[in-house]
Amino acid sequence: MAWFRPPPPHTQLRPWVPDAIFIPISRAVERVGVFFYNRVLNKTEVGLFDKRWNKNVHGPYCHWRYYGKLDTKFMDVKLGDLPAWMARREKTPSAFYNEFMRNIWRVHNLYYSGPVYNNTVKVIFRFIFAYSFLNWLVKSHRYVDFQKTMYHW
């Protein structure tokens, strides 16, 4: 385990690749990243806040909140109004992705963080329970024959 010990003070560590090769390559990769950010990512809406969010109206930004115009909830829609309600929905892939991520953040805020952070032990036991339950669900078909023969030894 000598490789695990820290080196003595003032030890000069030599890079694996000579600096004459490593520095120009890393500089080129850095410049390509800057070029990609300036020419491609900067012209998109990736990573920006929702356009409909207004700090003065809504307060601090929340990922799990929908900042669009409020509409009737699906369970409150009458059958006659269903086609009109569906026509008002945005059906682009980005809208589906945004809705999915909003729900991910909402669940994260409700159960794993939020104003009162959960006890670490509670979160660990939640994951243990989820893992155990999923394993039981996947492997339960193995015990069907045993259940049939339980009273017939």
Curated annotation (Swiss-Prot):
Keywords, ordered alphabetically: ATP synthesis, CF(0), Hydrogen ion transport, Ion transport, Membrane, Mitochondrion, Transport
Tell me where it resides.
Mitochondrion membrane
- What GO cellular component term, any one, is given? mitochondrial membrane
Give the primary localization class: mitochondrion
The GO annotation for biological process reads: proton motive force-driven mitochondrial ATP synthesis; proton transmembrane transport
* Assembly information from the UniProt record: Subunit of the F-type ATPase which has 2 components, CF(1) - the catalytic core - and CF(0) - the membrane proton channel.
Q: Which PANTHER family match?
A: ATP SYNTHASE F CHAIN, MITOCHONDRIAL-RELATED (PTHR13080), ATP SYNTHASE SUBUNIT F, MITOCHONDRIAL-RELATED (PTHR13080:SF20)
Q: Which family does it belong to?
A: Belongs to the ATPase F chain family.
Annotated function? Mitochondrial membrane ATP synthase (F(1)F(0) ATP synthase or Complex V) produces ATP from ADP in the presence of a proton gradient across the membrane which is generated by electron transport complexes of the respiratory chain. F-type ATPases consist of two structural domains, F(1) - containing the extramembraneous catalytic core and F(0) - containing the membrane proton channel, linked together by a central stalk and a peripheral stalk. During catalysis, ATP synthesis in the catalytic domain of F(1) is coupled via a rotary mechanism of the central stalk subunits to proton translocation.
Protein known as: Putative ATP synthase subunit f, mitochondrial
| Native species | Caenorhabditis elegans
